[in-house]
């Protein structure tokens, strides 16, 4: 793998910025308006990467996911778990466990989106 993945044909050039990636879990109710805004922007960057990296479609992460508290909480938990896989002390099997949790989370995300009835370009919240 090359150091700059954008130069590798397998990794197409992406248009997202690297998230700040604070390793603390996001507890939305206790954040100030500024902290909530910053955390939301960071989470949006991570979700853009997640959607790109795993080829997720709108049935899993709808474009209006930020307007659904249950999706924000689930995605926040996924991000926190993912970050913890890369913090010390490292656990070699942590990413495998995260992927198992991610598989379960995709089912829940899809079910919530299905119940909400949202589609690309159409929010029904």
Protein language model annotation of sequence segments:
Residues 35-36, 54, 66, 83-87, ...:
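Soluble extracellular-acting proteins and domains
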Residues 12-24, 44-54, 72-74:
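Short, compositionally biased low-complexity segments
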Residues 21, 39-42, 58, 75, ...:
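Intrinsically disordered, low-complexity regions enriched in Ser/Pro/Gly/Gln/His and often acidic
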Residues 51-85:
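Amphipathic alpha-helical interaction modules
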Residues 88-125:
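Amphipathic alpha-helical binding modules
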Residues 1-38:
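The feature captures two recurrent sequence modes
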Residues 42, 46-49, 70-73, 77, ...:
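Charged, amphipathic alpha-helical oligomerization/scaffolding segments
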Residues 30, 34-41, 62-72, 96:
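Short, solvent-exposed segments of well-ordered alpha helices
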